[in-house]
Amino acid sequence: DGESGKYQKINLSMAVNGTDTQIDSLVARHFADLVSERSGGNIVIDVFSNDTLAGGNSTKGVEYIAVGGSDLGAYATCVLANLEPKLSVATLPWSFTSYQQAREVIDTTGGEYYAEMLANKGITYLGSFHNGFRQLTNSKHAVTTPEDLKGLKIRVPGSAVYMGVFKALGASPTAMSWSEVFTAIQQGTIDGQENGCSVTKSA
């Protein structure tokens, strides 16, 4: 209700894997604004993009949350799966046929599943948002069939599922922090990447 007397003054840290302009950071800052407003300014959440609290390492970022090094976090399930591999289920390709179906699952049984898995690691699940279905971009050629992926060096997040999928399709997957992707494509270290359109635009 925003009555400041009802809330203890406190500063919290929120770790985010995305860049400053990525939807992860935008959502995190909006969340921080809402908390500040509704606590009468007593609860301040400082948002740290690019996993700066963990030296740019997203795996360490989620580990810090689990041990209390960061108070809050906004991470993709493929990153959270470094804590609990069973969370990779949502990153399996072609699991959903539409945004509506994905939203319905995540808002009900899927969210309950996440909450249980994360609670076992000492993390409280507050909710979710999405970056959109993933789209492939690359600097070499159009990809319209699985065969077109053969030999392409594709950046993937640090996820066993993504590594396995792209290897199976004949690509050469490389795990890399998102903040390094644009430069890596320019330098030819990788040929491309796959993400939701909003994430790709943020590069």
Residues of each region from the PLM?
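Contiguous mixed-secondary-structure segments that line small-molecule binding/active-site clefts
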Residues: 33, 63-66, 71, 76-172, ...
